[in-house]
A protein has these predicted regions:
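Accessory alpha-helical/coil subdomains and C-terminal extensions
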Residues: 42, 107-109, 115, 119, ...
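Glycine-rich oxoanion-binding loops at beta->alpha junctions
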Residues: 7, 52-107, 113, 146-153, ...
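C-terminal non-catalytic interaction/assembly regions of soluble proteins
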Residues: 244-332
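Single conserved hydrophobic/aromatic residue that forms the stacking wall/gate
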Residues: 1-11
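Short glycine-rich or small-residue beta-strand-to-loop segments that form or flank ligand, phosphate
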Residues: 12-19, 74-79, 103-107, 173-176, ...
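A glycine- and small-aliphatic-rich helix-loop capping segment at beta-alpha/alpha-beta transitions
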Residues: 29-38, 58-64, 119-130, 146-150, ...
Length: 332
């Protein structure tokens, strides 16, 4: 990213690392075009940190990011790199930046991507600004991450379809959504689809309590039911929970649906496109102001700068009011 040309700073590089999220292309577009707006050059690193180590770097012009704002995935591709986790790997990455006369970096990703960026800063003093891009919405210091809104809408659309077939047969469906360590997707999907219950990693699941709740709320002869399960739920995911409930209640007609990677794909929502555009420009602005080792986020509709140390070390908790909302609205 940044190169000194006379008295001007020029943004030079950006990469997407870790899991992809809808809206990353909109963020890439915003970084490239805002850099060009300031009279700077923009480069893309293909394949995340491993691509940086390999020197897979290409200049991006305005036309290169035309017609990508509506596309899911990332034109820069994304990958996890075990080599970058070593000091030798990071030294190679820093050498490639120096070789291409790159002075700063914009990283779009989650806490793993930012942890790698922080090490690059500590060991090689390279300015890095992060843009939160993860469907999990689990990054401290921002109300929403790029991709979260789209993932929720994708899951809601799928669950609505599942509810149709569940209703036709009076079935109880356990629907698993993404969320290995966080239940933000599960919680919002549960509220939006009128689910009977939601199981999230942040709260230990008591199967007996769930069974008692379903006994009151679900009549297999007269109604259907939906339970939303985050993949990281401590009871072991939707299949394990469904099996345990089924053993206790063989009269239930139980089915399981795992939504999986469909939640990462698809055209980003309008909300994610706007958010990505805002944060992409904010990242360039931060580098132009000599900021480094920060994530740009949005809190209460305002752009904020959050130190990497803070967003990596702190956890973002679920809203207890929303958890209570599921309980209140599930009563029949």
């Amino acid at each position: 990213p940044l190169r000194l040309v006379g008295s001007e700073m020029c943004i030079r590089d950006r990469l997407t690392s870790g899991g992809d999220a809808p809206g990353m292309n909109a963020a890439i577009r915003a970084v490239v075009r805002s850099a060009i707006f300031y009279g700077c050059e923009a480069y893309g690193i293909y394949g995340g940190y491993q691509g940086l180590i390999n020197g897979d770097i290409k200049r991006l012009r305005s036309q290169d990011v035309s017609n990508i704002i509506q596309r899911g995935g990332t034109i820069l591709k994304s990958a996890r790199s075990t080599e970058f986790r070593t000091e030798e790997g990071r030294a190679k990455a820093a050498a490639k930046l120096a070789e291409h006369k790159i002075d700063a970096l914009v990283v779009i990703g989650g806490d793993g991507s930012f942890s790698g960026a922080r090490l690059l800063i500590q060991e090689h003093d390279i300015p890095v600004v992060g843009i939160p891009g993860t469907i999990d919405n689990d990054l401290y210091g921002t109300d929403s991450t790029i991709g979260y809104d789209t993932a929720v809408n994708t899951a809601v659309e799928a669950v609505d379809k599942i509810k149709d077939t569940a209703s036709a047969h009076n079935r109880l469906f356990f629907v698993e959504v993404m969320g290995r360590d966080a239940g933000f997707i599960a919680l919002r999907v549960a509220i939006a689809t009128g689910a009977e219950a939601v199981l999230v990693p942040e709260i230990d699941t008591d199967i007996t309590d769930l069974e008692h709740f379903l006994e009151k709320d679900y009549d297999p002869k007269q109604s259907s039911g939906i339970v939303i399960v985050a993949e990281g739920d401590k009871a072991g995911g939707a299949y394990n929970v469904a099996q345990k409930v089924g053993e206790a209640h063989p009269e239930y007609d139980i089915r399981v649906s795992v939504l999986g990677h469909m939640q990462r794909g698809g055209s980003p929502s309008a909300f994610d496109r706007v958010l990505a555009s805002q944060l992409g420009v904010a990242a360039v602005d931060a580098l132009m102001d000599d900021q480094k080792s920060i994530m740009v986020g949005i809190m209460n509709k305002e752009i904020v700068h959050v130190p990497f140390n803070k967003t990596i070390k702190n956890s973002k908790g679920l809203n207890p009011e929303l958890l209570n909302l599921v309980k209140i609205l599930s009563n029949r």
